[in-house]
Amino acid sequence: SKIYLAAALSLLEKALPKSDTVLYVTTGKTSQMTGQKRVNLEILNKKYGVRFSVSEDGALKEFEVRSESK
C-alpha cells in the first residue's frame, strides 16, 4: 500500500488537485490504494485538503495511478 501512496503523491505533486478527486488503479488494487483503515486516503486528504476516492481502471498497469478531479 505504501507503493501506491508514493505513486499517488508523485502524480499529485504535478496535478495539485483543487476539488474532489478520484484515483484510478488497476483492477483488484483498490484496497491497496486505500490503505489499511483508509490511512492512505487520510494522508492525501490532509495534505491536499480535498476528498479522494478510489476506483478501478483495467487499462492501468500494476502500481500505476491516474487521477481525475470532479
Feature map (PLM): residue ranges:
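Auxiliary Fe-S-binding modules of radical SAM enzymes
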Residues: 1-70
